[in-house]
Amino acid sequence: LDELFGEKMDILKKLGIEENNYGACAGPGQWNATTAEGNIDSINPATGELIASVYQCSTDDYESVVQQSLEAFKEWRKVPAPERGQLVRQMGNALRDYKDHLGSLVSLEMGKIKQEGDGEVQEMIDIADFAVGQSRMLYGNTMHSERKDHRMYEQWHPLGIVGVISAFNFPVAVWSWNAFLAAICGNTTIWKPSSTTPLCAIAVQNICNEVLSANDVPNIFSTVIGRGSSVGETMINDSRLPMVSFTGSTRMGRHVSEVVSKRFGKTILELGGNNCIIVDETADMDIVIPAIAFGAVGTAGQRCTSTRRVIVHDSKFEELRDRLVRAYHQVNIGDPLENGTLMGPLVNENAVSDFENAIEKAKSSGGEILYGGSSIDGDGNYVNPTIIKAENKWEIVQEETFAPILYIMTYSDLDEAIEMHNGVPQGLSSAMFTLNMRNAEKFLSSVGSDCGIANINIGTSGAEIGGAFGGEKETGGGRESGSDSWKQYMRRQTNTINWGTELPLAQGIQFDLSE
């Protein structure tokens, strides 16, 4: 291991990553030492080399983690919410201390460039700060009763164990969006990370363990690592988990929704995106080009909010095409941990195959390759970012391909552009570049974008935690972060107090008993 990574060993050692790691943890000192379920190998997508291995969680391990999480919940729910917020504050501070190393591990294991890896950890810090504030704002409502000498109010209580099933593309941030808000609401969390990025989860759990141990609080953060077909299925079928937050494909999200709803559990679904930018005839091209390039190329097109389609006014097409191609020539592809790299590899060989298949489908439909269009030979899962002139109705354009493929189309009338924009099954993020106020307002109105996120003069990716994140249609309808996101992690209770001497019934009903 030392020979393979040299200076990169410092990243692993700092975060408590060994050559072989256990795959289930219920808190400080609670790593279950099961080895019989086989290994999950973590592969560096930039080189194809083994980073480290993780022993998969067993059924007994899972059961042990759930039982301990249930016991932790019984105590944690009694802790005042502002005090719970102080623990999350310390989690944020610990993440500040580990930001450089954890950001590097995200880059090493997932493949996004170092700046984006650090940015993902910063998202964790930001949501921690946000959750601390929210811990003092879990507001209920009071209302007047129609009955004399009565008072009514609504209050909120924690749910219990929140299950978080996250995807490889944001291997640490998505957990924090859920776990920190769930924690200030009085819940515990069990996390099943992507089996593609298990080391990131182990590192985060180790950081959690440090904070939990230092504060002598219940073990509210737990991790179970294993294949989705085993550990994931167990989680979504487990009625002891009243809430499951799932991030992943639309196909798997539909399955999760069906299984959890059958047991009347709650879900937060963050699924596919087919995000689009409309560029009208008044757009400032000096900000359009970098916005499209970052949206399409950032994280090698593996963000849920990656820009996948551009619909440009006829009069702007040639300028946009030429300037965008020049910009793509400047994208330095290489080791995500090296300074100056703007695009790293795809996460694995399957992702490269999906990229190549999508290119072939687009070409067979009549697509014109304007830039790229091929994978890169050699070590690692590298591809060339690709621009294709296409039509919105093509099957491949209607699908989400998790890769740096950008489809460009033209329009002459804004209503036509909006119809094309909305004419896909997904509805996550959208943007319009314009200096025309009427066009901007129309795009943001009820007859405009049908997405959960709609922007003006800013791209489709790079959402901030202060606003609700999520989408419509096959994106799943879930929302994370934002002003009232805490309500998803709590149950609402209506209370009526009679402080008088009589028992009037609602709606003036009379129910006289003769004694």
Explain the meaning of each model-derived region:
Residues 33-34, 39-40, 56-60, 283:
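A short acidic/small-residue loop/turn micro-motif
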Residues 49-138, 149:
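Glycine-rich loop-to-alpha-helix module at the N-terminal edge of alpha/beta enzyme cores
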Residues 140-287, 411:
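Rossmann-like NAD(P) dinucleotide-binding subdomain of oxidoreductase/dehydrogenase enzymes
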Residues 1-46:
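Hydrophobic face of amphipathic alpha-helices that form TPR/SEL1-like repeat modules
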